[in-house]
């Protein structure tokens, strides 16, 4: 019995060794147009300034660390089926935006028009203007040790049927130490800070695709739609957290496009999950019809709602103890240059009983919150 078990170990060990040495790099044979495809992200919005982001796809071999290639110096405009044109302004990094909220007619159809810097012309299909109903409420609950945000909405006219959501999260956070001094490298001295770096804010946008359809329900009601989730001890909830949710009404073609994108990007994990498939949007290259363009343009009035969640609503053990430690640094030129000229930041000036002065200090991320966010308070913050 032992011998049989021994031979079984030998067999599986050899099999594992052979399989591990049979890895061959896979280099897909993609067309150049598929490795440099135009990616269009945005929505023709009648309730907020219109914003589109244009970029180019990357080669698979570029890896996750490669930066997205922004599409710069393009001419971008919104057009309707009554010959009205609304030019967008380039803000940089591939962002094109209207100065203000556009006055759009709900009975018209709309499309996006792009002329790239090299003269390629792109046009989306005309789409109907479809307005979103208001968001009824956004709530949250404790779930799986974390916090799950939830959305409720409904359309009394039973005409929306297809929904998509995006959101922006903003959270306030603080460093373990509040610093009142900063190192002046030019003069090798420590001076009082002129701005606080203890209290900061950070903002991030949703990257997943959030969809729902009520076509199989008796009424056009969305109940407890899960959106952002924060795991246990998430620092987003260390002080105050806010989520701004934007809701879009889609037509059935647009919904099917986003559903396919969701299946291709979020639901592929095993042989039992939906497998990747080709997803066609509604944007086309007029000058080169064979060129691949990624994206789908919808139009309508979005609706949005913001809520705040305070750390005071979290369990007492939500905020984990900091692993930041402070040290004492003598107040002399050599020590200041050695410590503060590298990785430490001063915190306080301390006068010892002997009359000598020293500085308490800590690693920069433990002192300066602007390394991770901004110390400018958002206009919507309470």
Give names to the regions the model predicted.
Residues 18-21:
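C-terminal motif of bacterial Sec signal peptides marking the signal peptidase cleavage site
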